[in-house]
Regions:
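Gly/Pro-enriched, hydrophobic low-complexity segments
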Residues: 115-163
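A short, Trp-centered hydrophobic/proline-enriched beta-strand micro-motif
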Residues: 21-41
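Positively charged n-region of N-terminal signal peptides that target proteins for export
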Residues: 1-3
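Flexible, surface-exposed loop/linker segments and immediately adjacent secondary-structure boundaries
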Residues: 85-122
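Short, solvent-exposed coil/turn segments at beta-strand boundaries
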Residues: 25-26, 50-57, 72-76, 117-119, ...
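Hydrophobic h-region of N-terminal signal peptides that target proteins for export
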Residues: 5-14
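Amphipathic hydrophobic-ligand
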Residues: 42-49, 69-72
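An acidic-aromatic
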Residues: 53-98, 148-153
Length: 163
């Protein structure tokens, strides 16, 4: 009975964590993305906003250092590079990882390689890439990962006061 209780308790914790993650990404968010620039040994930062409309489409605005807008829908990502007046589209099947798809469609415990580290930290592994999530507070979520160029990235999402 003790082992069954522990298994049930672990499933309950991971379900609650997944649900908290899904609920978090329903909010309007501000974010800071930090990555290490290996060419000049410095940290590069991008600042922006994340929002979701009533049709579950996502809009990501990069405000600095470059002005870009990403529209994510069921077909893929439309990218507007405002400073260069360029627009391009990437189909869902051409997106190299599923993290954006998870954020758009929701994280589901049964489809994830999910590891609970503690009450506030967990790891999702997808195609041999690790994504580390940590709830810093109810209003702040941090994601750490290596990108497709094997550079360390850190994104801090914070809830905006308006929902």
């Amino acid at each position: 009975i003790y082992i069954i209780f522990l298994l049930f308790f672990n499933l309950l914790i991971s379900d609650n964590t997944i649900e908290s993650l899904n609920e978090f990404f329903k909010n309007n968010l501000e974010f800071v993305q930090t990555s290490f620039n290996t060419i000049n040994n410095s940290f590069d930062k991008s600042y922006g906003n994340f929002s979701r409309d009533l049709n579950n489409n996502i809009k990501i605005e990069i405000n600095s250092p470059f002005k870009e807008i990403y529209f994510i829908n069921e077909d893929g990502i439309e990218i507007h590079e405002l400073e260069f007046n360029q627009k391009r589209f990437i189909k869902n099947q051409d997106i190299p990882n599923n993290i954006l798809k998870f954020i758009k469609n929701g994280f589901r415990n049964e489809s994830l390689d999910f590891e609970q580290i503690d009450d506030f930290k967990f790891k999702i592994t997808e195609f041999e890439k690790n994504y580390y999530f940590e709830f810093i507070s109810n209003d702040t979520l941090q994601i750490k990962y290596k990108d497709n160029m094997n550079l360390d990235n850190l994104i801090n999402f914070s809830k905006q006061n308006d929902k």
